[in-house]
Regions:
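Structured core of small recognition/catalytic domains
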Residues: 154-157, 161-234, 250-251, 265
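Short amphipathic alpha-helices within nucleic acid-binding modules
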Residues: 80-87, 218-224
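N-terminal beta-strand motif that seeds the catalytic metal site of vicinal oxygen chelate
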Residues: 1-19, 70-73, 123-157, 207-210, ...
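Helix N-cap motif at beta-to-alpha junctions
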Residues: 14-15, 78-81, 152-153, 214-218
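Core segments of cupin and vicinal oxygen chelate
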Residues: 1-2, 9-56, 147-194
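Short acidic/glycine-enriched loop/turn segments that link adjacent beta-strands
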Residues: 37-44, 67, 102-106, 173-176, ...
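Vicinal oxygen chelate
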Residues: 85-139, 179, 225-275
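Polar/charged low-complexity regions in secreted precursors and cytosolic/nuclear IDRs
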Residues: 52-53, 69-74, 79, 114, ...
């Protein structure tokens, strides 16, 4: 089965600002900026979608009951019926649901055995629109990985690997993480331990951060500094308690791919790498 990790979603208190941040720093693009459809989405606190040419990001306006932050990711498969068949056969406790037709990416929604939600679709699905139907393009700055912290990383990695034929990348023997790749984008499955949060605020299992590959980490640092001066609204979120902030950043920095860590205006942790 050919599988592409081509989507993730953010729930945001200010989704227009959050999308603008990724446009400004990583040159991500909207499909129809300024269109009536987009303006209606903004007026109704719905969502906007941006893309690096391969991975689409839907930034959703926060509604009552929604938890802000990285919300879910999505995969595109070449045979969605076969993917659903595998999941239902091997993991009967996992639910797969048809999604409403107004979702720009998700044709189906499902979850892994620990309850982490993900979207499932295939090329040509009738619901797909916006950045998710545009031709692929290359650009110097692109989404490189997502990190998912779980209680049982071996079992969850097996679920995604065997259900969707993602390739497991090589790693050091002492590395507790699993690296599942479609050849371009990587899903990192990492252990969640409460002890990792000693001395800092505790966060639940789930998506931890997003990583971008860039042409020059130093250039990104300079552009972030300039952005703070030019448009303070787009400055990153900080943790007021210094020691707790250092502890949380250290967790993000443990990613083998990351060279520099920061956060978006909404507090989404981001790391960047050149290789």
């Amino acid at each position: 089965m050919l599988t592409r990790i081509q989507h993730f979603a953010i729930v945001s208190e200010n989704f227009v600002r959050e999308a603008k941040f990724y446009e400004s720093v990583f040159d991500m693009k909207r499909s129809k900026p300024g269109s009536e459809e987009e303006q209606k989405a903004i007026r109704t606190n719905y969502a906007v979608s941006i893309s690096d040419g391969y991975v689409g990001v839907t930034v959703i306006g926060r509604k009552p009951g929604y938890v802000p932050g990285l919300h879910h990711f999505g995969v595109d498969v070449d045979d969605v019926n076969e993917a659903i068949r595998r999941v239902r056969k091997n993991y009967p406790e996992v639910a797969v649901l048809k999604r409403p037709s107004n979702r720009p990416f998700a044709t189906y929604g499902a979850h892994d055995p620990e309850g982490n939600y993900f979207d499932l679709t295939e090329e040509g699905a009738s619901n797909r629109r916006d950045v998710y139907v545009e031709a692929q393009r290359e650009q110097p700055r692109r989404v490189h990985h997502l990190k998912l912290r779980v209680m049982n990383p071996a079992a969850i990695a097996a679920f995604y690997r065997d259900s969707f034929d993602l390739r497991e990348a090589d790693k050091a023997l002492e590395d507790p993480n699993y690296y599942l790749t479609d050849g371009r984008m990587t899903l990192i499955i990492a252990p969640w331990k409460m002890s990792d949060f000693e001395g800092a605020g505790i966060d639940r299992p789930g998506l931890e951060h997003v990583g971008f590959k860039v042409e020059d980490v130093g250039a990104v640092k300079k552009e972030l500094a300039a952005l703070r001066e030019i448009n303070p609204e787009l400055r990153e979120r900080i943790i007021s308690e210094v020691s707790e902030g250092e502890r949380r950043l250290a967790l993000i920095a443990s990613c083998r791919h990351g060279q520099f860590q920061f956060s978006s205006p909404d507090g989404i942790f981001v790391d960047v790498c050149e290789h």
